[in-house]
């Protein structure tokens, strides 16, 4: 793939969406796995496969996927979650690659929440660089409770369901620490944007 692609990931409530917005403000093209995931499960062949595996109870009255119902079902059962991932993840990966390849600009930022779970570049070998946004567990926990209006126990369960912080940081080429200071965060993003533009210019010359 000729475009210089940077993968962005991070734990839940660490600030992936905020970081993506800051990069967009610098005229960086952003491709988001969550958006593609929503498109993938619209009525069509992928949704038909999901219904065949999980039953029609996962559908709303209008025939669309009841995302909240399915999320609650697979969250409580690892085997069910893996079955769902086996259906949707290959399609999402393909969609991400296509969208990234079509992106304009010197580089593209690809937001992939489960990048570490996919093995980093093992799952996405076309990424040239991986950026992880990180926050200390206490801050992450508090943000999640506030964002989703949930109690401490629910927040802990949601965080525990993800890959560990250590494993996520291990795949990083670059790390942004989101400590809640917008000036500090913006400065980190500006520095990284300049670095990625420089790397992309060299990559374009030799690709």
Curated annotation (Swiss-Prot):
Domain of life: Bacteria
GO cellular component: cytoplasm
GO biological process, one term: coenzyme A biosynthetic process
Predominant place of localization: cytoplasm
Reaction(s) catalysed by this chain's protein: 3'-dephospho-CoA + ATP = ADP + CoA + H(+)
InterPro entries, alphabetized: Depp_CoAkinase (IPR001977), P-loop_NTPase (IPR027417)
One of the Pfam families matching this protein, by short name: CoaE
Record-stated family: Belongs to the CoaE family.
Function description: Catalyzes the phosphorylation of the 3'-hydroxyl group of dephosphocoenzyme A to form coenzyme A.
NCBIfam families on file: dephospho-CoA kinase (TIGR00152)
Protein name, entry field: Dephospho-CoA kinase
Organism: Xylella fastidiosa (strain 9a5c)
Organism lineage string: Bacteria, Pseudomonadati, Pseudomonadota, Gammaproteobacteria, Lysobacterales
């Amino acid at each position: 793939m000729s475009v210089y692609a940077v993968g962005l990931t991070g734990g839940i409530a660490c600030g992936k969406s905020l970081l993506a917005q800051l990069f967009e403000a610098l005229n960086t093209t952003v491709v988001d796995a969550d958006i593609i995931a929503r498109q993938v499960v619209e009525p069509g062949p992928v949704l038909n496969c999901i219904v065949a595996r999980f039953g029609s109870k996962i559908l709303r009255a209008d025939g669309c996927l009841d995302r909240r119902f399915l999320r609650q079902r697979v969250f409580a059962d690892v085997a069910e979650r893996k079955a769902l991932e086996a259906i949707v993840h290959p399609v999402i990966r393909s969609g991400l690659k296509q969208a990234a390849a079509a992106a304009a600009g010197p580089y593209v930022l690809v937001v992939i929440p489960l990048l570490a779970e996919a093995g980093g570049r093992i799952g996405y070998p076309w990424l040239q660089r991986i950026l992880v946004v990180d926050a200390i567990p206490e801050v992450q926990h508090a943000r999640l409770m506030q964002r989703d209006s949930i109690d401490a126990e629910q927040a802990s369960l949601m965080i525990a369901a993800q890959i560990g912080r250590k494993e996520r940081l291990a795949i990083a080429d670059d790390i942004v620490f989101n400590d809640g200071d917008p000036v500090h965060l913006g400065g980190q993003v500006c520095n990284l944007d300049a670095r990625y533009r420089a790397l992309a210019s060299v990559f374009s010359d030799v690709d």
